Curated annotation (Swiss-Prot):
This is Protein SCAR3. Expressed in expanding cotyledons, expanding leaves and expanding siliques containing developing embryos. Detected in unopened flower buds. Reduced expression in mature leaves and mature cotyledons. Residues 174-191 have a biased composition (Basic residues). It comes from the Eukaryota. The keyword Cytoplasm applies. Belongs to the SCAR/WAVE family. The lineage of its organism: Eukaryota, Viridiplantae, Streptophyta, Embryophyta, Tracheophyta. Involved in regulation of actin and microtubule organization. Part of a WAVE complex that activates the Arp2/3 complex. Regulates trichome branch positioning and expansion. The gene is SCAR3. Residues 802-814 have a biased composition (Polar residues). Residues 954-972 form the WH2 domain. Residues 365-382 have a biased composition (Basic and acidic residues). Gene3D superfamilies: 1.20.5.340, 6.10.280.150. GO terms for cellular component: cytoskeleton; SCAR complex.
């Protein structure tokens, strides 16, 4: 408190008074001092309020908490005494070792906290008290038409934000869709204008051909000029537009083509027309004839009548000249008349020229009747050879590169509507699989077979050259056979392989060609030559700009019905991969029986090198592709199958399905055994598969069965266990080789011990390795020296650590090898097989010392000539466990008997070398065996006599008893030190004394058994 309280106020209060009036001066001074005191008290009050802020609240809370704590403490005091009484009343505490206290202590469940109150601390509660309230949305209610409280309700309602977010996402999707539509429309417009300029410049190209006029059904098309140099560049784009045209127009050009077929009379037949399903890779089809501009406009202007649709469904076969008429009629309705004139010329040339597929599609050559003269056939022959030469000359034109990368991107933009495109393709496949047989007049119409195979010409140019050579010979042979009217078989072998290098696995393509030459003279005298090509497996990882699409589109309805009736589904027996076991029966593959028996097929299997072994996905991928049949399947044609009528061509199915089915079946049989169902694959019964190139013969069946067996015995499955286990299918299990389970009862005289024994060291990484619990005798306490346990307790030097340090046994794998026939074995042999060997030290040769009498009645096991640190053998088992040994164990007994004899000879030489050994023997040994021991021995001898009367034991049995039974006497105490040898080597003397004493016991047992009760001992 400041001394001058008057200075805290203004001095004018008392200075401005009248100096002559002292009373007024004193009053002013008093008021000034009072004001200063009051101001100072106010400051003190504020300071005290800051210091003692909330102290009263804290005091009240502390008092309340202390009261609650006192109540809880009373509860604890009432609960603890019963627990303490129960704890002190327990006699054993062994059960505490089996409680999960180690895991319980770190995670103490807090059910009720006795020391801390439920309220949060003030340091946590203060931020909640000091935070601001909700936003003052009520200020916006005056701008809302719903009245007061509407803004708070609106902005706190979760549905409002849900609706707002959904509207925003819908707006974004609509904007993106409109943008993509505009971009696609722009690309289509530019592509159409570019194609119009391409078609306009067709006549100015270098590779031009002039074709003669062609007459069919009274209609003649004029001579045109066209070029095929630029077809490969635009092939992908034209094929796409043809598909889109088909999907938009309903059924595609099949409907319009059916009109010409229905107008064709039954008796009429085209003259000198060869039908080809596909041309060279650079050639054009009916889809390429229709330009993109016409395709875009035709779906808006062209309408199909219902009668035409019905005719399309009813008709099953049309020819290229009929398509020419329809295409010409369509071209007249459009604005691009000049382009369509050139397109019609291309179709006319297709009708005039005898074309064929160069290893890509299916080709049908339909010859005329036998009434046609040889000149006409010779013309066809020369025309076919000329066509081959023209195709050879046009190889370089075909191999021209594509336009640019921008064009490829624009083509990729056209595949936006993928779902509709796929649906239209499936409809076209169903619509194009048509064939018709005119059985009324015996006239076979031309069958339409369309196979579209788009491949990169740069990669497969060599296949075109090989195809030309092989087809050149094919044309010559076919026409030569026609002239000579013979049924000579035509063999065509075409190898086409397209290797795509992947990151982890190799992908293979296989092209199979099954050439069937069916020479049959029917009532009309007509010859039919059929060549059917099945495309190879589709590579699934190629770019979309390089579509390798193989469609086999010709199927005969009758052949399909016959083959579907004979085909059996694939059958697989499996246990679902339970515990890694193999199926009880191997996978059985049912081969189709509807194919021609004359066809022979080569099947080659290319095994893939496994990629990184630590990647399970790569292993599964390799397993699924391991069984793909590679290279070529060469089918030798023969006479027609008698089961097929009217010379119908055998149906072709897409080869991709057969390859996927075979790889799926073998892959599933492989994956059932390794990692379960890792990959979703279609089963065989879910697919309609008619593998036309795989005949049913013994070679194929044997080959496939060999593949199946080879994969079942795969090296990755059971290599470590083929030689050890009786079967190849051993389940895997966690490594338990370090575990030892032992059971030692403490209250039994002859305790049994169960040990966990493994078969061998190869089962380290198995999940469930096989093991056996083998009985062993337990050891009693080493300080028990009573006469009752003299012959049943083990050596005092024996301990559990010695069991661990022991080599488990010499025959560690014998019980494992004999586990298959162990049902007839007895429990005693398990005991015997695990007590065949003892530990051998490097310093001294330790082996049991055995003595065998002349009568071969008793053999016992003596202790080691070893230092006390080495373990001694366990006590002998009960008499009922002593059985004869197996032949394998008898061979080991012979070797160990020789060691016993050498050890015995060594011991007696040591004993004879001692000068006073026999004289001081009574003084060295404390006492002879007591009568109780002798009585016990006599009882044992009596039991042995009874067992000997029942069955005469063999020599190996006695040697086994030497190893298994042991008479442990009391420890020998040295009582004299007069012998120099005993002083220098007390250990040997102690051992020799023990040996002699035990030998005396043996002598007594043998003498009592033989009837000789003399106590004299002879070394012989």
């Amino acid at each position: 408190m400041p001394r001058n309280v008057y200075g805290m106020n203004q001095s004018e209060v008392y200075r401005n008074v009248d100096r002559e009036d002292p009373k007024a001066i004193l009053n002013g001074v008093a008021v000034t001092g009072l004001v200063g005191v009051l101001r100072q008290l106010g400051d003190l009050a504020e300071f005290a309020a800051e210091i003692f802020h909330g102290i009263q609240e804290e005091v009240m809370a502390t008092a309340s908490r202390s009261n609650q704590l006192k109540i809880r403490l009373q509860h604890i005091e009432a609960t603890v005494p019963p627990l303490e009484k129960a704890m002190l009343a327990q006699t054993t505490h062994i059960h505490f070792a089996y409680t999960g206290g180690l895991e319980w202590h770190p995670r103490i469940p807090i059910t009720q906290n006795h020391l801390i109150y439920d309220d949060l601390p003030h340091i946590i509660m203060d931020p909640y008290e000091e935070c601001r309230g909700p936003p003052r949305l009520h200020l916006l209610d005056k701008f809302d038409i719903n009245g007061p409280g509407s803004c708070l309700k609106r902005y706190s309602d979760p549905t409002y934000f849900r609706r707002a977010s959904s509207n925003l996402s819908q707006g974004n999707k609509k904007f993106q869709k409109d943008k993509k539509h505009c971009k696609m429309k722009k690309k289509k417009t530019s592509s159409r204008s570019r194609d119009m300029s391409r078609l306009a410049s067709l006549a100015n190209q270098n590779a031009r051909k002039t074709f003669a006029s062609f007459s069919f059904s009274g209609q003649t098309s004029s001579t045109k000029t066209t070029s095929t140099s630029d077809m490969e560049k635009r092939y992908d784009f034209q094929d796409h537009h043809s598909r889109s045209f088909e999907s938009r127009s309903g059924s595609g050009y099949n409907e319009c083509l059916s009109t010409a077929t229905s107008s064709l009379k039954t008796g009429e037949r085209p003259k000198g027309v060869f039908v080809s399903s596909s041309l060279t890779p650079g050639s054009c089809t009916i889809a390429s004839v229709l330009s993109e501009c016409e395709t875009e406009d035709a779906h808006d202007n062209f309408q199909f009548s219902p009668s035409q649709g019905q005719a399309a469904r009813g008709s099953s076969c049309v020819s290229w000249d009929e398509k020419a008429e329809i295409v010409e009629s369509l071209g007249l309705q459009t604005d691009e008349a000049s382009e369509m004139v050139e397109a019609n010329s291309v179709v006319d040339t297709l009708d005039e020229k005898p074309s064929y597929g160069e290893g890509i599609g299916g080709v049908d050559f339909h010859s005329k009747d036998n009434e046609n003269d040889k000149s006409e056939s010779g013309l066809r022959k020369r025309a076919g050879i000329d066509e081959v030469r023209e195709i050879k000359n046009g190889r370089e034109i075909v191999g021209e590169p594509r336009d640019s990368e921008q064009e490829t991107e624009s083509e990729g933009e056209c595949f936006v509507d993928a779902l509709n495109t796929i649906e239209s393709e499936s409809e076209n496949n169903q619509g194009l699989q048509t064939s018709q047989v005119s059985s009324s007049c015996g006239v076979a119409d031309e069958r339409l077979e369309k196979s579209v195979c788009e491949q990169e010409t740069e990669q497969n140019s060599y296949s075109v050259e090989d195809s030309c050579r092989s087809m050149d010979g094919l044309m010559a042979n076919s026409f030569k056979n026609e002239e000579n009217a013979s049924s000579e078989n035509v063999s065509v072998e075409m190898h086409q392989q397209n290797l795509q290098a992947g990151s982890d696995i190799n992908r293979l393509q296989k092209n199979d060609l099954c050439a069937n030459k069916d020479m049959r003279n029917d009532s009309g005298g007509k010859d039919t030559i059929t060549f059917t090509f099945v495309p190879g497996l589709e590579n699934s990882l190629v770019d979309s700009s390089n579509p390798l699409i193989h469609h086999g589109l010709q199927e005969n309805q009758e052949t399909e019905a016959e083959s579907s009736g004979d085909l059996e589904a694939f059958k697989i027996w499996t246990n679902g991969g339970l515990l890694g076991l193999k199926p009880s029966k191997p996978p059985v593959l049912a081969m189709p029986s509807s194919l021609s028996p004359d066809c022979k097929t080569e099947e080659r299997t290319v095994g893939f090198a496994e990629a990184e072994k630590d990647k399970a996905d790569d292993l599964v991928e390799n397993a699924s592709h391991r069984h793909v049949l590679n290279n070529s399947s060469l089918a030798t044609p023969g006479t027609q199958n008698p089961g097929s009528s009217n010379g119908i061509v055998m149906g072709i199915v897409d080869q991709r399905e057969s390859h996927e089915t075979s790889s799926g079946v073998f892959g599933l049989s492989h994956k059932f055994l390794t990692s379960g169902f890792r990959r979703k694959d279609s089963f065989a019964h879910d697919r309609k598969t008619v593998p036309a190139t795989i005949p049913e013969n013994d070679e194929v069946t044997t080959e496939r069965r060999r593949f199946c067996d080879q994969d079942i015995n795969e090296k990755t499955f059971m290599d470590p266990f083929r030689d050890e286990a009786p079967i190849d299918w051993i389940t895997s299990s966690p490594p338990l080789q370090h575990m030892k389970i032992s059971l030692n009862p403490a209250d039994t005289l002859q305790a049994s011990r169960l040990k966990l024994k493994f078969s061998d060291g190869d089962n380290t990484y198995n999940t469930f390795s096989s093991f056996q619990l083998l009985p062993e005798t337990g050891t009693s306490l080493p300080d028990s020296y009573s006469d009752d346990d003299t012959f049943c307790r083990s050596s005092p030097y024996m301990s559990d650590t010695d069991y661990l340090s022991d080599n488990h046994s010499l025959s560690n794998s014998e019980p494992w090898e004999e586990s298959s026939d162990s049902h007839g074995r007895k429990e005693q042999e398990l005991y015997d097989s695990f007590h065949e060997s003892r530990h051998v030290d490097n310093n001294a040769e330790a082996s049991p010392l055995g003595i065998k009498s002349e009568s071969s009645c008793v053999a016992v096991n003596l202790s080691y000539l070893q230092n006390p640190a080495e373990p001694l053998p366990p006590p002998f088992p009960p008499m009922q466990w002593m059985v004869s040994k197996t032949p394998s164990e008898k061979m080991e007994d012979k070797t160990q008997s020789l060691q016993l004899q050498e050890a015995l000879r060594f011991a007696f030489e040591k004993h004879i070398s001692l000068p006073t050994a026999k004289n001081e023997l009574p003084s060295m040994v404390t006492s002879a065996p007591k009568p109780e021991i002798k009585a016990h021995l006599k009882n044992n001898v009596r039991e042995e006599k009874q067992s000997a009367n029942a069955k005469e034991t063999e020599t190996g049995d006695f040697l086994q008893q030497i190893r298994t039974q042991q008479f442990n006497l009391r420890p020998v105490v040295m009582t004299t030190t007069s012998s120099a040898t005993a002083t220098t080597d007390p250990i040997i003397n102690t051992k020799i004394s023990a040996i002699l004493e035990k030998a005396n016991s043996i002598r007594q047992a043998v003498a009592s058994k033989d009837g000789d009760e003399s106590d004299t001992w002879s070394d012989t």
